[in-house]
Amino acid sequence: MARIGLYPGTFDPMTNGHLDIIRRGLKLVDHLIVAIGVNATKTPLLTLEERFQLIEQEAGPIAKELGSKISTASFSGLVVNAADEHGATVILRGLRGAVDFEYETQMVGMNRVMNPHVETVFLAASPDTQFISSTLVRQIAGMDGDISPFVPPHVKAKVLARVAEQKKSR
């Protein structure tokens, strides 16, 4: 039986930290589903389709290199329900520090009550990515800062194009 993992997030935009977790997560499961959470109350910088494309473009070659399977999906609602819907028995989460740990351990407890068949696996962020967040990347890009240390080149191009569009329309 294949081990299926679900790596949830908004990936707006996908960062080098996300890619690090994807690379390491692919070594733990046979099939990793990168699941983009959709929240109707938020307006993302990148469209859902753009995020799918960037994840597939950046993570696809990593999966191929490792001989693993990767796919993308979207979900709204509870992560544990999305895991169940996709047949995942593992939810993969990256931890950047103590604040992430506190929040994520609460979520593990809640998820375990809702579905005891789904386990959560924490991967500590690598030292060179533990400070990266999508929120900070968007803020830096919006202030004309250099985001190249934090995101892959294709992501940088898409983010900068979108930020430029937004500035034109103001």
Curated annotation (Swiss-Prot):
GO terms for biological process: coenzyme A biosynthetic process. Disulfide bonds: none annotated. It is found in: Cytoplasm. Its EC number is 2.7.7.3. One of its GO terms (molecular function) is pantetheine-phosphate adenylyltransferase activity. The keyword Mitochondrion does not apply. It is an enzyme of class 2 (transferase). Its main location: cytoplasm. Pfam families: CTP_transf_like (PF01467). Substrate binds at residues 10, 42, 79, 93. Pathway: Cofactor biosynthesis; coenzyme A biosynthesis; CoA from (R)-pantothenate: step 4/5. Keywords: ATP-binding, Coenzyme A biosynthesis, Cytoplasm, Magnesium, Nucleotide-binding, Nucleotidyltransferase, Transferase. CDD domains: PPAT. One of its GO terms (cellular component) is cytoplasm. ATP binds at residues 10-11, 18, 94-96, 104, 129-135. It comes from the Bacteria. Its cofactor is Mg(2+). It catalyses: (R)-4'-phosphopantetheine + ATP + H(+) = 3'-dephospho-CoA + diphosphate. The record marks 18 as: Transition state stabilizer. SUPFAM superfamilies: Nucleotidylyl transferase (SSF52374). Homohexamer. Reversibly transfers an adenylyl group from ATP to 4'-phosphopantetheine, yielding dephospho-CoA (dPCoA) and pyrophosphate. Belongs to the bacterial CoaD family. This is Phosphopantetheine adenylyltransferase. It comes from Parvibaculum lavamentivorans (strain DS-1 / DSM 13023 / NCIMB 13966). The lineage of its organism: Bacteria, Pseudomonadati, Pseudomonadota, Alphaproteobacteria, Hyphomicrobiales.
